[in-house]
């Protein structure tokens, strides 16, 4: 019977340094317990394909060549890694401020993005310096920073099915904790979701018959002042109202109004032989002053009789 593979190690460095194998076995001793073995894959290419039945608890990928952790390679690792398994990537990477000299070279942000798209979560980036595993995988051909990225595969897998529990039939709402035990809501659980209510209660007495003799009633007449009780003064009518014209001793101002009306009336002489002291009366109302006697009359020529034009004598349709 074939032994179960606990940890899968990808590396493009041969021969394999003893320090690397010792470090992997020490770090992943829990995954290698119970008879599980360490499987090592050398010279990994970008289009790496593993056996269909491969299933491991942890994957370690140590590459001294930049750009080996392509999206297709990360997707293959995600396929063989069990849900909840850990994944460690070690690769020379450029910092974001450096110019990319090689098309296969990635940055920290680019590698994290590819890990996320492949389905890995909780990625943590660490710069590895002064460690034996880092010395074994460094290269002098390109000035890069050796970066270790730790991530995990979610505990759930794609197309996973979860059964929803029905609500508790007991009185009151219930919820479940991590041990799947029903927990009842308390008043403290909902204090943030409801408005605080005052403990004081306003009591209304609706038994009163409103016939208490001790109650004092206010007389509305007491609210009136002496000025309110005075009768209003009726305005006096004009002294010459019954007559058609103002009387001799007019004091109401009617005589002045009649004088102004007389001044504005045109005489026969003004119609037959119109004159103008300003010279603008015959041009129309737009050029006439406010007290002009010719206001409302059509345009005319000075010295000629004022007549209405034919358009004035035709009724509007």
Swiss-Prot record:
Stretches for region Linker: 163-229
Domain of life: Eukaryota
GO MF term set: 2 iron, 2 sulfur cluster binding; 4 iron, 4 sulfur cluster binding; electron transfer activity; metal ion binding
Fe-S binding site A: annotated segments: 240-252
Chain intervals for the UniProt region annotation (Fe-S binding site B): 278-292
GO CC, alphabetical: cytoplasm; mitochondrial intermembrane space
Cofactor requirements of the protein: [2Fe-2S] cluster; [4Fe-4S] cluster
Binding of [2Fe-2S] cluster, residues: 240, 247, 250, 252
Location of the motif Cx2C motif 2: 289-292
Region (N-terminal SAM-like domain): 1-162
Family membership: Belongs to the anamorsin family.
Domain notes: The C-terminal domain binds 2 Fe-S clusters but is otherwise mostly in an intrinsically disordered conformation.
Protein name: Anamorsin homolog 2
Lineage start: Eukaryota, Viridiplantae, Streptophyta, Embryophyta, Bryophyta
């Amino acid at each position: 019977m074939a032994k179960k593979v606990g940890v899968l190690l990808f590396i493009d460095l041969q021969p394999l340094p003893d320090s690397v194998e010792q470090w992997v076995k020490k770090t992943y001793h829990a995954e290698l317990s119970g008879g599980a073995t360490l499987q090592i894959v050398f010279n990994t290419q970008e289009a790496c394909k593993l056996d269909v039945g491969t299933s491991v608890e942890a994957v370690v990928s140590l590459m001294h060549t930049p750009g080996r952790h392509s999206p297709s390679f990360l997707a293959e690792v995600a396929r063989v890694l069990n849900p909840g398994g850990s994944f460690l990537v070690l690769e020379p990477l450029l910092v974001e401020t450096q110019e990319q000299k090689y098309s296969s070279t990635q940055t920290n942000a680019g590698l994290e993005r590819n890990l996320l798209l492949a389905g890995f979560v909780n990625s943590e980036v660490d710069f590895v310096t002064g460690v034996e595993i880092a010395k074994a995988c460094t290269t002098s051909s390109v000035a890069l920073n050796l970066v270790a990225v730790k991530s995990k595969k979610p505990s759930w897998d794609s197309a996973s099915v979860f059964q929803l529990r029905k609500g508790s039939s007991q009185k009151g709402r219930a919820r479940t904790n991590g041990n799947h035990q029903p927990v009842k809501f308390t008043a403290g659980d909902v204090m943030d979701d409801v408005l605080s209510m005052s403990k004081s209660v306003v009591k209304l007495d609706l038994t009163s018959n409103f016939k208490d003799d001790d109650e004092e009633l206010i007389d509305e007449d007491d609210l009136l002042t002496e000025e309110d009780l005075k009768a209003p003064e009726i305005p006096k009518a004009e002294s010459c109202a019954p007559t058609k014209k103002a009387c001799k001793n007019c004091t109401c101002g009617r005589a002045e109004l009649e004088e102004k009306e007389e001044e504005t009336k045109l005489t026969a002489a003004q119609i037959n032989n119109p004159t103008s002291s300003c010279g603008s009366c015959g041009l129309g109302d737009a050029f006439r002053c406010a007290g002009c006697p010719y206001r409302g009359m059509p345009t005319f020529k000075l010295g000629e009789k004022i007549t209405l034009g034919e358009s004035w004598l035709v009724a509007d349709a």
